């Protein structure tokens, strides 16, 4: 008996994607990684992608450069105009994330979806440890952080797969 088989990846349908992946809560990042057969590694990479997404929400610098070249003149009795425009843009993220944890993980087809959120309270602790801020600034940041974390907890209670 001789068998030939052809395998293909299951098609990812939008109805299968977790609700929290489409409309992720504030202070959360989404990681999606195509499985390679080793769940531990796949999970780690998906979490890393989620942290990268989260860091991009917190601090992103956009550097752009536009080069414009224009030339005009006359060649063999004919006028000519030449324009060239180039645009280069780079998004840079550099953030230290204290207390980010994966709060939801779901495998859909060949993809690992991970929701990585700031752990309630950890951001507040990190702010409290900042020495560069005066006492009033730290207190105000802690208050805002507490409010944001309470909103996050409330949102997470209402999120289902």
Give the predicted meaning of each segment:
Residues 6-161:
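Domain-level marker for long, solvent-exposed, non-transmembrane regions
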